């Protein structure tokens, strides 16, 4: 498949940018400015799909052509949505909650053709189990990584692997952009990541 349309990433996330760059994708960044508020009446998957759609629509309002990619990620533990921590104390509480437990990384992805307004959406779910995390390990981890811009207060690609006992599903989803789902969505627009 040939990529004749420009790709627009509606995210300021350095992790999503890095994932696309590693594939050799050429794209522009038009970050969305929407407030990422969870709707408690919606399921986790409905929330990430809704927020990724709002981000994509926000970017689409700023440009006239191109294929817009937007994503939103959360961590879910026993039905509780863990977004980005409010502060370091909140981040520490999140990792203590995740200690020795299985949780889900869920990312909603929306692709919009800015010209035709065609929309396609998907979501990915990855199961992750953490090792037992003591306070010293959490403090050492926070010296290596700023947890405040990360759902669940960790990043698998930034020394977060040392926290993880097992993972089942898309690794790139845990980073914040499930490349398999994204490539399927882009195919609906005649575009491929590779």
Predicted regions and their residues:
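Cofactor-binding loop segments of dinucleotide-utilizing enzymes, especially the Rossmann-like FAD-
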Residues: 12, 32, 114
